[in-house]
Curated annotation (Swiss-Prot):
This is Nucleotide-binding protein Emin_0125. ATP binds at G12, L13, S14, G15, A16, G17, K18, T19. GO terms for molecular function: ATP binding; GTP binding. Displays ATPase and GTPase activities. Disulfide bonds: none annotated. Keywords: ATP-binding, GTP-binding, Nucleotide-binding. InterPro entries: P-loop_NTPase (IPR027417), RapZ-like (IPR005337), RapZ-like_N (IPR053930), RapZ_C (IPR053931). GTP binds at D61, I62, R63, E64. It comes from Elusimicrobium minutum (strain Pei191). Belongs to the RapZ-like family.
């Protein structure tokens, strides 16, 4: 039986971004565990054989102390069990590490003066750096840039559903703006099908309503312009590390105009290669 499970071991200097990296892996859909004692690694991996998770990220740091020297052998044993193992080592300049510790007020795991602690940690982690498959210098990286770098490392391993999840939501302003919305657009400038006797009881998912709305040039013009704006914005949000985006489309009651526009945008974004879900909050109210 072929084992498709992949284990990414994240390690590196304290303050270089291990915790943030694990959060990013979690956003990518990985099953993440931080600070699992190395003595339990092989038992944990054996346990994973019967779990559904295929992508796992494990955090390792200097707090493992003398046990760190066993990691190369542990990795070799895990590979023998047919797991795909990839080690990422995070580093940053001494000055940046000092700055980060100063900003966060965290104490270094090695109880010494900070500069001395960083120097000792570098020396102790050198064997791990030497076996790492990828080393990332986070000195000048924003969170979004770190995520972008990790994305490139994982590009061959990530599932489609670990990409940015886009939700297009229709709603009625009289029922309140959705709290989860990242972007809100008001389409009440479009003629309202509600005032057409034959359309009043229908919704924006019905063909007669769609035809009515699209009979007005401003509807098509809006769709084209807003879609182009979203195609511009979405990659920018992804670059900054955003994993979820909720686009809320509102009209008066949330039954006609917003539903049609939300449905049309969902189809267009999907055709453009984005992962999109659609939800009509107030369509039955």
């Amino acid at each position: 039986m072929i084992n498709n499970k992949k284990i990414f071991i994240i390690t590196g200097l304290s303050g270089a971004g291990k915790t943030k990296a694990l959060q990013i892996f979690g956003d990518f859909g990985f099953y993440c565990v931080d600070n699992l004692p190395l003595a339990l690694f092989e038992h944990f991996v054996d346990h994973l054989k019967n779990r559904k998770e295929e992508n796992i990220a494990l955090g390792v740091d200097i707090r493992e102390g003398k046990d760190l020297k066993t990691l190369p052998k542990i990795i070799a044993n895990i590979k023998k069990a047919d797991f795909h193992v990839y080690t990422i080592f995070l580093d940053a300049s001494d000055s940046k590490l000092v700055q980060r510790f100063s900003e966060t007020k965290h104490k270094h795991p090695i109880q010494k003066k900070l500069i001395a602690a960083i120097a000792q940690e570098r020396k102790q982690l050198e064997p791990l750096r030497n076996i790492a498959d990828k080393e990332i210098d986070t000195t000048n990286l924003t969170l979004g840039e770190l995520k972008e770098k990790l994305s490139k490392v994982l590009v061959c391993n990530l599932k489609k559903d670990s990409e940015m999840q886009i939700s297009v939501l229709s709603f009625g302003f009289k029922h309140g703006i959705p709290l989860e919305a990242d972007l809100v657009v008001d389409v009440r400038f479009l003629p309202n099908p509600y005032y057409q006797p034959k359309l009043k009881e229908k919704t924006g998912l019905d063909s007669p309503v769609a035809k009515y709305i699209m009979s007005f040039p401003e509807a098509n013009e809006f769709l084209i312009k807003y879609l182009n704006m979203l195609k511009f914005l979405i990659p920018k949000y992804m670059k900054e590390g955003k994993s979820y985006l909720t686009i809320a489309i509102g009209c008066t009651g949330g039954k006609h105009r917003s539903v049609f526009i939300a449905n049309a945008l969902t189809k267009a974004l999907s055709q453009s290669g984005f992962t999109v879900s659609e939800y009509h909050r107030d369509i039955k109210k």
